[in-house]
Regions:
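N-terminal pre-domain segments of enzymes
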Residues: 1-15
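Envelope-exposed proteins and targeting segments
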Residues: 15-19, 38-42, 52-54, 83, ...
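Beta-strand signatures of extracellular beta-sandwich domains
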Residues: 55-59
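Extracellular/periplasmic metallocenter environments
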Residues: 1, 28, 81-147
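Asparagine-centered strand-capping/turn motif at beta-strand->loop junctions
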Residues: 46-48
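N-terminal edge beta-strand
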Residues: 11-41
């Protein structure tokens, strides 16, 4: 139930970090780009700072496209899925999601016309780094090196 290409509903006890996202009437998400590791469970705390209703839906490009087409056909359709949050002006909500696949996924607002106006963002899921050394290494500065 609720599983899509981007992963599956997460369990609060497994949340590794919280990412805050705001939605505005400029039809923008802030931030509009998020990077997570495969297997991570993320709590998205989403706030609608606009006057209009906005939503945040997480999925693959195909999931979002299909959902958007449904919303165009049935604009008043009530839908409550674990991969989305639907917020009136000033409201705050959350999505707890576990990213099980590596790749690029989307989050978008599918209120009629908002997606087309550019209300979308990218979630990049990367493989967890097994080599911890690579993380701490700083690039060596060779500018002072002389022969």
């Amino acid at each position: 139930e609720g599983v899509n290409k981007a992963g599956k509903p997460g369990v609060a006890a497994n949340v590794v970090r919280t990412i805050h996202i705001t939605m505005s009437d400029k039809n923008r998400f802030s931030p509009n780009s998020v990077k997570v590791k495969q297997g991570e469970t993320i709590r998205f705390v989403v706030k609608n700072v606009g006057k209009k209703k906005h939503e945040m839906v997480i999925g693959s490009v195909e999931d979002i496209k299909a959902h958007n087409e449904m919303m165009q056909r049935f604009p008043g359709m009530e839908h409550d899925e674990p991969n989305m949050v639907d917020l009136e002006s000033g409201q705050k909500g959350e999505i707890i999601w576990q990213f099980t696949e590596v790749g690029q996924f989307q989050f978008a607002c599918l209120v009629t016309g908002h997606f087309e106006a550019g209300m979308k963002g990218v979630i990049t899921v990367v493989k967890p780094s097994t080599n911890v050394k690579a993380k701490v290494q700083t690039p060596v500065d060779h500018s002072t090196h002389q022969h």
